[in-house]
């Protein structure tokens, strides 16, 4: 059930962060948004997050650095990376870090849902 799935969104772009959070809530997901990787790492949401959506390029820790930091702490969660600057090298690094999806901004609702369904083990 979607309402049981907490999706954490980490993006320094306020409009993207709010739009993604609003979309997920409208689809029945619990969603919480953070403006930086550091803010997410300090939060109580880590242990409850079913899927992480993280911007690749952010000030401070990047989304990929966030994924490595979580792994170093022994925290494993499906991660979907989003980026306004799609580059093959970045995509490869994201997938190596364990990404279940890599989307270029702007992405479609359908693309995001497909990645989420895969991350959460849902079938459509």
Please name every model-derived segment:
Residues 33-51:
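Acidic, metal-coordinating helix/loop segments flanking the phosphotransfer/catalytic sites
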Residues 14-32, 119:
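Two-component/phosphorelay signaling modules centered on CheY-like receiver
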Residues 65, 86-101:
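Alpha4 helix (beta4-alpha4-beta5 surface) of REC/receiver domains from two-component response regulators
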Residues 58:
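Receiver (REC) domain active-site loop signature in two-component systems and cognate sites
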Residues 89, 107-117:
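C-terminal output helix
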Residues 76-86:
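A short, hydrophobic beta-strand element within the central beta-sheet of small alpha/beta folds
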Residues 35-36, 62-65:
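Acidic catalytic/metal-coordinating carboxylates
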Residues 52-55, 83:
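Active-site residues of response regulator receiver
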